[in-house]
Each structure stands twice: as C-alpha cells, then as structure tokens.
C-alpha cells in the first residue's frame, strides 16, 4: 500500500511539473512580443520629408475675391503715373521670373504704413493671408540694359483694366489685382499677345519650382533652390532683399541671370 501511495504521489508531482512548464511557456509567449515592438518603435528613424511652402489654397482665394467686391476696386494702372515710364524700342532677349517672399514684403509694408496699408498691398498682406513665395512678375529683359529704364516697358501703351474673372484665376500666385494688372501692362504686353497667355506662363513656371517654406539668407536660398530643383543646378540666380530671380532664354530654358 505504501508503495502504491509513493507511486501515486510521484505521478501527481510529474503531472504538476508538466502543467507548470506549459503554463510558464504560454505566459512567455504572450508577453515576449511587447518589448520587441517597443524596441522597434524606439529605434525607428523617420525619413526627412520635403515640406512645401505654406499658402492659402487657390480656390479659397478665388472665392474670397468673388465674395469681396473691394478686391477689384480701382485696380487699373495709369501709365503716365509710372515713375519709370515707357520703352517700346528695347529688344526682348530673355525673361526674368521675379518671386517675392510674401512675409518679408508684408513686414516692410507694415513697418512703413502701419495699419494703413496702400491698396496695392492690402489683399496680399491682409490679416487672414498665409502666403509664402508668390510671383511678382515675369519680365522681358534687354541683355544690354544699363538701368531699369533700358528694359521693355508698356509696349502696348496704357491698356484698359482686365476682366475681374480673369484676375481672380491668378490671385493665388500673384495676390493683388493691381499687381496683376500692372505686370501685364508694364511687362507682359511686351512679349505676349494676351494677358491670359502671360499669366498662364507665369503659373507654369511657378508650378515647376519647389520653394522653401521659410526665410533664408541669399546663399542658403540659392543652395536650397539648386538642391531641390535640378534644372537650376548650374544656373546663376539673382536675389534682392525679399526677392528671388530666375532667368529663362526665349525657348524657356533656364539660363544665367546677368550679374549687373
């Protein structure tokens, strides 16, 4: 009897040992993935992403223009009031795309005028605008010009105001009805048959560029543009206080901007 009891006890101990083994194994399986996942989360390195410049959506700007009739008040440009004037004899040798850093431009406007912004900058620098780089203009250039007066200007004279619905289409890239009207009269008319063609070319060139979403020094801006825009890699660019200049030949290939 004692022998039977000992044997039975031994069997019970073995069963308990086996049960304990499988219980511990199951717990280990259920718990082990968690540290691995956590480790993966900790060691994963996020890839750098290109952040495009911030801007109000084009459709929002167009809707705003339609709802606000004051956007299109007194936007015509009078040639006789222009301080530089007309030059119909200068040749068109190449083109310069002038881009403006809107936050910098608006800071200067506010420093100069405070809350009494001139009508030409009210739309661009309004309190609800979040624009980055915008198109100042696309300028036909004379390669032999010695001053700004030597470039083509007002080649078709003092033109009438453009239709409001046409201007509204391009406020997202050139945020000002007077800006658009003036650039067409002063510059676009010297190389394009219509304002529609002129603005469409501006939009095409602007859309082909990647632009930084922050203010950079001149050299930093040039490096950034060449790094993110292969077509600019070997080109000489131009810049002023808040503007960037990119030049194109008459076949719309990027070329060096003149240093003078």
Model-flagged regions — what are they?
Residues 33-37, 42-112:
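N-terminal module-boundary/linker segments of secreted carbohydrate-active enzymes
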Residues 1-36:
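Sec-dependent N-terminal signal peptides
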Residues 27-29, 109, 147, 178, ...:
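Amphipathic alpha-helical interaction segments
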Residues 76-173:
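Betabetaalpha-Me/HNH-type nuclease active-site subdomain
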Residues 12, 94, 126, 176-177, ...:
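Intrinsically disordered, low-complexity regions enriched in Ser/Pro/Gly/Gln/His and often acidic
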Residues 16, 162-260:
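C-terminal, well-folded lobe of enzymatic/effector domains
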